[in-house]
């Protein structure tokens, strides 16, 4: 498979959300860079007997909204996007990895994200959905990455027997059904995440592309410690660098960053649930190795773990409600200037001193799994 093999890719996406005859399918796209993907998916959906509507949600227009719109308008669900969720049985959003320059008051950016988060909640509750993140040369250049490498890894990440991957990951999730505590640790600190009584679920070719992770919803008041995310990533058009979070009894009580701190604080103050975690996840896609700065891709990398302040997956037993759901990725492999780290769940090592252990590598998708040394 290569980056332009859209016919294969969109069949995987359509299979993942179960597009079938009579379905009402809404499609969003954030930039013309993904138009070939959108066209291929629309054609595939019509071929299957669905009714398809396409909405342009180009993120470049956000700058005008941020400049002129009142706060109450920014923080409300965009009406056309909300109407699409009410109409749809299936929703797919093709999101180009672009680098819009957002220069606005962080409180206004957070308000805009809050409005979009309301649409995301509708998407979760009402539709069978998928997000497809697509790399671009512009993104690679902005993040000082080799564009060919990023595209090559991205294309390879689709190439798996997803039904078999789902079986393997489900078996691991079943194994974790009695787990009590997950711990992420490195030389900068440790974060203890309570997961007792929660359900783990596999993401294996259904709601996000690239895909490949297992995840659960932390117990709301059972997360404590400190975690640091070295390096830079982008959220809402703003670069956040060297983020550090401190949690006590499930609540984020302090945040620090060398860049983007004002946005971080504004996002975490969005509503009552934004300072509690809604997700704890572990990446399982071995085809992805490069931290791109795009959270939707990086969270799938084998050797990483991630947390998400905000809205919890109810299917995991999570009850935290928020307009925010913000995945933040911790690279435990020691790449990109950060130290090697470890992940254990109860007394079982999943990643130890930067090395993926067999319990995790054996469920990996993509290129041949990594194996811990004997």
Model-flagged regions — what are they?
Residues 41-47, 199-200, 243-246, 272, ...:
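Short, solvent-exposed amphipathic alpha-helical segments in soluble enzyme
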Residues 10, 176-177, 220, 236-239, ...:
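Short solvent-exposed loop/turn micro-motifs enriched in small/polar/acidic residues
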Residues 1-225, 360-374:
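Active-site bordering "gate/hinge" segments
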Residues 224, 254-321:
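Dual-mode signal for accessory low-complexity, basic/Gly-rich regions
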Residues 86-88, 92, 187-198, 204-221, ...:
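PLD/PLD-like phosphodiesterase catalytic module centered on the HKD motif
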Residues 32-33, 97-99, 136, 198, ...:
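Short, glycine-/Ser/Thr-/acidic-enriched flexible segments
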Residues 293-371:
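Internal helix-turn-beta structural module
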Residues 221-266:
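Long, well-ordered mid-to-C-terminal structural blocks that present hydrophobic/aromatic surfaces
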């Amino acid at each position: 498979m290569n980056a332009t093999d859209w016919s294969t890719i969109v069949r995987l996406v359509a299979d993942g959300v179960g597009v079938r005859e009579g379905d009402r399918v809404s499609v969003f796209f954030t930039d013309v860079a993904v138009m070939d993907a959108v066209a291929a998916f629309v054609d595939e959906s019509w071929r299957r007997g669905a009714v398809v509507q396409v909405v342009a949600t180009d993120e470049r227009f956000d700058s005008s909204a941020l400049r002129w719109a009142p706060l109450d308008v920014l923080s409300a669900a965009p009406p056309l996007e909300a109407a699409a969720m009410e109409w749809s049985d299936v929703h797919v959003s093709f999101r180009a990895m672009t680098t819009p320059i957002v220069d606005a008051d962080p409180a206004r950016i957070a308000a805009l994200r809050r409005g979009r988060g309301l649409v995301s909640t509708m998407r979760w509750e009402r539709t069978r959905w998928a997000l497809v993140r697509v790399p671009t040369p512009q993104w690679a250049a902005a993040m000082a990455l080799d564009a060919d490498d990023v595209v090559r890894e991205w294309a390879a990440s689709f190439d798996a027997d997803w039904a078999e991957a789902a079986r393997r990951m489900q078996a691991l999730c079943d194994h974790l059904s009695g787990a009590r505590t997950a711990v992420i640790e490195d030389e900068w600190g440790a974060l203890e995440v309570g997961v007792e009584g929660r359900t783990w679920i596999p993401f294996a070719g259904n709601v996000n592309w690239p895909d490949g992770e297992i995840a659960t919803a932390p117990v709301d008041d059972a997360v404590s410690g400190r975690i640091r995310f070295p390096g830079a990533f982008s959220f809402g058009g703003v670069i956040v660098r060297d983020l550090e979070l401190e949690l006590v009894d499930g609540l984020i009580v302090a945040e620090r960053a060398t860049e983007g701190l004002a946005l971080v604080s504004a996002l975490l103050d969005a509503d009552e649930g934004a300072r509690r975690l809604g997700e704890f996840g572990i990446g399982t896609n071995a085809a992805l190795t490069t931290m791109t700065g795009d959270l939707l891709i990086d969270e799938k990398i084998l050797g990483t773990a991630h947390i998400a302040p905000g809205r919890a997956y109810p299917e995991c037993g999570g009850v935290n409600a928020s307009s925010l759901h913000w995945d933040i990725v911790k690279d435990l492999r020691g790449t990109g200037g950060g130290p090697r780290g470890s992940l254990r769940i109860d007394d079982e090592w999943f990643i130890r001193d930067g090395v993926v252990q067999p319990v995790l590598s054996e469920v990996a998708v993509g290129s041949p799994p990594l194996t811990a040394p004997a």
